[in-house]
């Protein structure tokens, strides 16, 4: 008897609930009253694209099909912030009386531009050339340190160690550091005078 109960319960136990539908308008074509009703949600979502210059409802879409649209339906207004400046319903993002602040997130990482702006500053010609000349030294030092660390890792892993190359790279690094240190005081005295 217990076997019969298990057998009768197994069909109900094997029925699992349907997985959730994340985009219901793509799956409910059989349930909807008309095939166009599930397309309406997508028209609402892509209003900004139509307002931004994408083809209107009468023009062919990317797939070559035209979007179904009623002949008497006026185009919905663009969302706030889109459309011609004269028709924008929201105010400008920054009050006109205040100074404009340009958005330059990477300004910290680049040097001042050369040209009329750089020519206007009195320190532009001399320091720019010396700054560019010294900019390669940290890169070279970094490269040397990477190679030295690679040799040290080879020693640790036991894959082989070239002592001559290690000594050469160390001496080269020390030489570059000395050259950089001797230039630094010269730069400071030149900039003060």
From Swiss-Prot:
Residues 71-95 have a biased composition (Pro residues). Signal peptide: none annotated. Residues 53-70, 116-127 have a biased composition (Low complexity). Pfam families: DUF5529. Residues 1-21, 53-96, 114-136 are annotated as: Disordered. InterPro entries: C11orf91-like (IPR040027). It comes from the Eukaryota. This is Uncharacterized protein C11orf91 homolog. It comes from Bos taurus (Bovine). The lineage of its organism: Eukaryota, Metazoa, Chordata, Craniata, Vertebrata.
